[in-house]
Amino acid sequence: MSYTLPELGYAYNALEPHFDAQTMEIHHSKHHQAYVNNANAALEGLPAELVEMYPGHLISNLDKIPAEKRGALRNNAGGHTNHSLFWKSLKKGTTLQGALKDAIERDFGSVDAFKAEFEKAAATRFGSGWAWLVLTAEGKLAVVSTANQDNPLMGKEVAGCEGFPLLGLDVWEHAYYLKFQNRRPDYIKEFWNVVNWDFVAERFEQKTAHSNCAK
């Protein structure tokens, strides 16, 4: 299977004034495309069982990848997986509600407390990386962060955390520097205006419906 750049499903300016069109275009058509190209190059010559895996499945099985290819696929299949989720997680005008809101209030105490923890994880991630809302194996919600293009699906030994990612925020400078320069906290605050809570809730509900550990 050859990876391809996913369509956004919306115009590059659809998230204005919160996320600017120029950044969105460069981020999607240049940065994400580079991860796709580099991942495809790294897949060449690998056994079919690895090549045919979906990216999220592949990065969950990094130990099965030959050592000489592992780093390239950790970075680039990771980048492809992360960005593919990121684009789907963005939309103006949705509302956090229903079972997901209830679970956030249960596990963080309040929506504001969740947002504060998420913002801290995103703001304090040194260098490049991601902040995540994940569903743990115990059926609880948690906030974690990863370096570079690591993903919680990679597991604790690789990424330093684990869980099923429901929502991720890219805090690489390429995600915000044209508009926000060094003001990462401002970018993080604007993120709440463009979270596609409908998508995140659907992801949460599908995962809990098929999980024996769901509470």
UniProtKB/Swiss-Prot annotation:
**A UniProt-annotated Pfam family:** Sod_Fe_N
Molecular function GO labels: metal ion binding; superoxide dismutase activity
For the biological process aspect of GO, one term held by this record is:
removal of superoxide radicals
The family database entries (Gene3D superfamilies) matched by this protein are listed as: Fe,Mn superoxide dismutase (SOD) domain (1.10.287.990), Iron/manganese superoxide dismutase, C-terminal domain (3.55.40.20)
GO cellular component terms attached to this protein's record: cytoplasm
Q: Which reaction does it catalyse?
A: 2 superoxide + 2 H(+) = H2O2 + O2
Identify the residues that bind Mn(2+): H27, H83, D170, H174
UniProt keyword Metal-binding, yes or no: yes
Q: Which SUPFAM superfamilies match?
A: Fe,Mn superoxide dismutase (SOD), C-terminal domain, Fe,Mn superoxide dismutase (SOD), N-terminal domain
Q: According to its UniProt record, which cofactors does this protein need?
A: Mn(2+)
Superkingdom is Bacteria
Keyword Oxidoreductase attached = yes
UniProt-listed InterPro entries: Mn/Fe_SOD, Mn/Fe_SOD_BS, Mn/Fe_SOD_C, Mn/Fe_SOD_N, Mn/Fe_SOD_N_sf, SOD_C_sf
- Assigned keywords, A-Z: Manganese, Metal-binding, Oxidoreductase
Q: What is its EC number?
A: 1.15.1.1
Matches recorded under PROSITE patterns: SOD_MN
**Main role?**
Destroys superoxide anion radicals which are normally produced within the cells and which are toxic to biological systems.
Q: Which family does it belong to?
A: Belongs to the iron/manganese superoxide dismutase family.
Which PANTHER family does UniProt cross-reference here? 37S RIBOSOMAL PROTEIN S26, MITOCHONDRIAL, SMALL RIBOSOMAL SUBUNIT PROTEIN MS42
What binding partners and quaternary form does the record give?
A: Homodimer.
Know the name of this protein?
A: Superoxide dismutase [Mn]
Q: Which organism is it from?
A: Haemophilus influenzae (strain ATCC 51907 / DSM 11121 / KW20 / Rd)
Gene for this chain:
sodA
